[in-house]
Amino acid sequence: MGLTTMYESLGVSRAVYEYGETILAALKPRFEAIDQTAEYNQTKVLAAMQKNKLSAGCFAATTGYGYDDMGREVLEKVYADCFHTEAALVRPQITCGTHALAVALSANLLPGDELLSPNGAPYDTLEEVIGIRPSKCSLMEYGVQYRQVDLLPDGTFDFDGIRAAIGPKTKLITIQRSKGYATRPSFSVAQIGELIAFCKQCKPDVLCMVDNCYGEFVERVEPSDVGADMIVGSLIKNPGGGLAPIGGYICGTAECVERCAYRLSAPGLGQEVGANLGLLPSLYEGFFLAPNVVSGALKGAIFAANVYERLGFRVVPNGTESRHDIIQAVELGSAEGMLAFCRGIQAAAPVDSYVTPVPWAMPGYDAEVVMAAGAFVQGSSIELSADGPVREPYAVYYQGGLTWYHAKLGVLLSLQKMLDAGLAKLPG
């Protein structure tokens, strides 16, 4: 049985498969560059593990308080060394990226302090954390002030506006690397470094925190290499490599991370407690595999951009732009288009491939969200997935794929479902 026949058995027509192969022929140089970045980042992770003398004893499970958990301590040293920070907090007790960000913000902001977002409105779930949408226990409820500076029309930072917004009470600047549910470009590490340097010039003691979700290992450097006081992310995204079943991380200065540890557990306890519950082998191995897994997801995003751009759909980033995260936005023009695309991603899944994604009122969002994610880990967005709020401009956000081949299948099946619904047409 040939490869084309295998794809046909999974629901991809010969015409769609051949269209995909035409697109791929032009992407080989870009894929080679991605492989080189993955190789570099693989050696970076390996060096951090070797430096900290990772041993089989580090995989031992702990329960209860988790005192003297050698494996947990080594894991945090590995993260700190890999991301070039003074300290790290890497815990399964951090349930998601939003939780990690909430810990980092609430630990380092006190009543009367001001939080500034220089990239406009934050990701949807952070609106309630901050209090933009009123919520119990939000930062605003505790007396933290909030200000934001919108991006310029071309998606770049408004440096004049940022300079004017930074004042005596500005304590922390939160920078969102990835686009989230927006159609702006994601920021490169170089752009983030330029912003941080500018903010520090305006107010030398201001803290700069970067939401690093979806960006880890996409480039050879991280925001922590260009002056970020904290970088924050989720282990069921890039750094977990698809194996971490839960968790989040905060890497940064010793002072910032110490405060985060006290906020996560309790004052006086900090990093000394927190049992690993037998999860360390998955957290270590996932981190080791992450550079390669991210490279496959990145190839899938570039493939999706080129597949849909050639058919006339607006894609962000476009088919030739440089990449700074694994997310690919595709504007499909209608709710029907979003649902068809997501049906294709779900049909490509190893888990729950037979179910049909439908919009639902997801906690933390102000519009119904449709999600396709037949994943081994619930909510894992380093696994093949697609989602988006069902509202204008009806953009679906595609990401992940534990292997490049799985990402490729997902993109082709999404297109097949679009064609079957009469919502797209192949060229020629």
Labelled PLM ranges:
Residues 86-93, 351-353:
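Short, well-structured beta-strand/strand-turn elements
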Residues 309-427:
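Conserved C-terminal alpha-helix-loop-beta "cap" of PLP-dependent enzymes
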Residues 78:
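Solvent-exposed, charged/polar functional surfaces in cytosolic regulatory/catalytic domains
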